[in-house]
Amino acid sequence: MAFINREILTFNYPEAKGVVVCGDIHGAFEEMVFKLCVQYGMTDTLLIVAGDCGFGFEKSGYYEQVFNKISRRLTKANNWVVMIRGNHDDPAYFQEQRIHHERFRSIPDYSIVTACGHTILCIGGATSIDRTYRLAVDSRPHSDQTACYWADEMPYYDEEVLSAINAQFKVDTVVTHTSPSFCELITKEGLMGWAKRDVTLLEDCEKERAILDRIFDTLFEAGQPLAHWFYGHFHQSWNASIYGVLFSMLDIMEFKEVLRE
C-alpha cells in the first residue's frame, strides 16, 4: 500500500517478517526470485533490489511476462520485491511506477519503505562508465523503442524532500545504487580506460559521489538514527562501519539481511 505524505511516497509492508537487500541483477528476475524463494527458502520477506534491475532494455510487455512467470512463486512464499533504479535502468520505469504489482514493483527516488520496524530511504542512480559505448549503440536505429543508456541516469540531491523526510521520519536504513565518496570503491583504476574516450567521465563520477556525500551529511546532521546503508553498482562485496553506520556494498545478486536492532 502506498500513499502521498507531503510529496513523500511511502510503501508499507506490515506482513513482512524479514527484509533483505540485493545487489544488481541486470535483468535476471527469475534467477533472483528462485534464489529468494527456493534456494534460500525465504518466506514472509521483503527484498529490495539496489538498482541495475534491467528495465528499459526490452519492450514493456516483456516485464509483464516476467511477472507472470514469477508471481506464483512470490505469492506462495509470501514474499515481495521492491526495486530502485540504477544507471542501467530507464528512470521512467521508476518515476512513473510502471511496474506496480503488489508483490513486484519499481519505486521512485526518495521513496520511504517501512517493514519489520525499519524505515528505509531508497535513492537510485549512478554514472555509466561505459556510456560512450552505450551512446554509440543507441545512436543506431531501434524499431522496438528500447535503449541501453539514459541521460538522466545520475542521482540527484533534493533538499526539499530530504527536509520533509527529516521532519516526518526516523530513517534507520538507506538503500542507494552508488555510495558516498568515503566508501569503496575508491580506486579509479577501472575508469581510466573509458576516461580516455570520455573527457568528462572522471568529473561526473566525482559529482555522483559528492551528491551521495550531501545526502549522507543531511541525514547525519539531522540526527537520523542511521544504522545500515546498502548499495550495489560496483560489482564487489565490502562492509565497514563508518561514523557509526554499517555500510555494505553488494556484489551482483548478493543478498544481505537488514538486521533488527
Predicted regions and their residues:
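Active-site neighborhood of phospho(di)ester-bond hydrolases with catalytic His/Asp-centered motifs
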Residues: 21-23, 47-52, 80-88, 106-108, ...
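Short catalytic/ligand-binding loop motif for oxyanion handling, primarily in non-cytosolic enzymes
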Residues: 28-30, 56-58, 90-94, 113-116, ...
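Glycine-rich phosphate-binding loop signature in dinucleotide/nucleotide-binding domains
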Residues: 39-43, 166-169, 223
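Active-site-proximal loop/helix segment associated with metal-binding centers of metalloenzymes
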Residues: 118-210
